[in-house]
Amino acid sequence: MTVNRDIYIVLTGTGTAFSGIIKWFTKAELNHASIAFDSEMREVYSFGRKKVYNPFIAGLIHENFIHPFYSSTDCAIYQLRVSEEDYDTMYNHVQGMMQNQERYKYHLLGLVGVLLNIRIDRENAYFCSQFVASVLEETTVHPVAKPSCFVTPEDFALSLNAHKIFSGKLSYYMHLSHTAALQSSSLHNPQATNPADYTAARLRLHEERAEGII
């Protein structure tokens, strides 16, 4: 029997000055990409600022979405079902990088290369969406048909639109996923519930109420 697992591509727009500069060039609202290995967003990785309030020190990071920095962050979350083998390959690849975290730097020149459509390689350096795409390249999962060095967050938004499970405030998603986790562990609800499925259902209900359907 084939066992499948879920990974999540998370696009965010933090509203910082650096994010605003990228937005000016890309014309996209969400300009940061991350890969998550659980629906509760406890295992989220990307390339970005290592200190929340210092954009000049950046590299490989394990993101903490419950930090107040993300309280007003907009996001879109995409769920991809992959084989257990592909899941393990991606997760182990990222964990291997995390063991040498200080070796990896943010590839600012790579962003310039994307804008100019010129490949600019730098050893052990990535920008956020390049990192996410490169992790996917380790497997059979290739949602964006271009080299990782040219992949932007907007490319994920366009190619994964059918897989979107949430769009809105990241803090609201975190609240819903936390509620789902509590429900699934409750003695009154022993049957486990995937927090992402629960969150998507809650979001649909919220939208239907807003439209007057319910």
Describe the predicted segments one by one:
Residues 1-214:
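Cysteine-nucleophile amide-bond enzymes
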